[in-house]
């Protein structure tokens, strides 16, 4: 049985990382990208003969101790103005620079997480699912519309997403969700320790700020963030009871009331009243875990035969 010490270190961890997994992860890192806070370009690892061996040793040490190097916990935020009016923070988008070496470890951790996450995610979630994407969901919506017309059914849609979804992820709730979803303690401990030591600095043309801690949100710029948010969103939809709800579009013996791509959700029903009922359930459960549906971007429309 898995045990955890009072310091949060796993006594009996998951199977060790293999060197071939490190080599594979390194090969997927994109070149010609800006370096993180450590200043090490990814191209350096491609010319060093023993790079894979050294990286494997470091990753294995992290795997065994669940403790991350400080440079791997740090991010550099670079704000880029989207509009001419650069007086408002909302008019900026942020580029996040992280260590390329940390990305290697994160890719390995992501692969392990996916093994446990995929069975937990509903079929209607297409985000970060192998062989699936936004095109599939668009095709599904078109198919549903065609079938609704064929069977002379009304159909109402509501397209929703969350206001700054990743920024408002509550860490304590996230760890609770990981446990409820059956994520092994070893992997959850690695994530908790990574987030506990998270630091960032903001770099502008005027200089760089001091390092500061971040206590909320899924880590910006990290490949794991969409995966973790998938579980966060799945928890919301389960508690909203969408799978058991009577509201939806009943086609081919199945009731369909939502399609998802990470934080983007399309709700659907045969009447405006049913659609509103679904929306209120999702809204209530979202607010319980700190997320708010964005009404600025929400769109809805109905089709009648």
What are these regions (language model features)?
Residues 18, 37, 41-44, 48-51, ...:
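Hydrophobic (often cysteine-bearing) scaffold residues that line and stabilize catalytic clefts
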Residues 90-121, 166, 215-244:
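Conserved pre-motif C helix in the palm subdomain of viral-like polymerases
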Residues 1, 32-37, 65-71, 86-88, ...:
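Short helix-interrupting loop/turn segments at helix-coil junctions
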Residues 1-90, 96, 100-104, 121:
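Surface-exposed loop/turn segments and immediately adjacent short secondary-structure elements
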Residues 32-40, 77, 87-97, 135-179:
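Conserved catalytic palm subdomain of right-hand nucleotidyl-transferase polymerases, strongest
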Residues 12, 206, 293-305:
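Short, conserved micro-motifs composed of acidic
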Residues 165-181, 217, 259-289, 303-305:
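Catalytic palm subdomain of template-directed nucleic-acid polymerases
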């Amino acid at each position: 049985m898995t045990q955890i010490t009072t310091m949060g270190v796993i006594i009996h961890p998951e199977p060790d990382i293999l060197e071939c997994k490190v080599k594979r992860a390194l090969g997927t890192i994109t070149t010609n990208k800006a370096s993180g806070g450590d200043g090490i370009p990814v191209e350096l690892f491609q010319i060093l003969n023993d790079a894979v061996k050294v990286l494997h040793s470091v990753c294995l040490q992290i795997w065994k101790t669940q403790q991350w190097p400080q440079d791997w916990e740090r991010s550099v935020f670079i704000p880029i103005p989207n509009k001419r009016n650069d007086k408002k923070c909302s008019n900026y988008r942020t580029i996040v620079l992280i260590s390329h070496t940390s990305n290697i470890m994160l890719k390995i951790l992501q692969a392990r997480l996916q093994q446990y996450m995929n069975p937990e995610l509903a079929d209607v979630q297409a985000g970060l699912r192998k062989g699936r994407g936004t095109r599939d969901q668009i095709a599904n919506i078109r198919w549903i519309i065609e079938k609704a017309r064929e069977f002379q059914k009304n159909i109402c849609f509501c397209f929703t997403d969350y206001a700054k979804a990743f920024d408002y992820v509550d860490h304590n709730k996230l760890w609770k969700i990981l446990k409820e979803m059956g994520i092994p303690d070893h992997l959850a401990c690695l994530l908790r320790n990574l987030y506990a030591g998270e630091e960032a600095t903001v770099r502008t043309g005027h200089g760089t700020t001091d390092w500061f801690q971040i206590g909320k949100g899924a880590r910006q710029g990290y490949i794991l963030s969409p995966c973790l948010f998938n579980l966060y969103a799945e928890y919301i939809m389960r508690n909203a009871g969408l799978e058991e709800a009577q509201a939806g579009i009943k086609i081919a013996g199945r009731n369909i009331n939502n399609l998802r791509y990470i934080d983007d959700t399309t709700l659907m029903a045969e009447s405006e009243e049913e659609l509103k009922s679904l929306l209120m359930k999702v809204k209530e459960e979202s607010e319980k875990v700190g997320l708010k549906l964005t009404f600025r971007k929400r769109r809805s429309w109905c089709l009648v035969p």
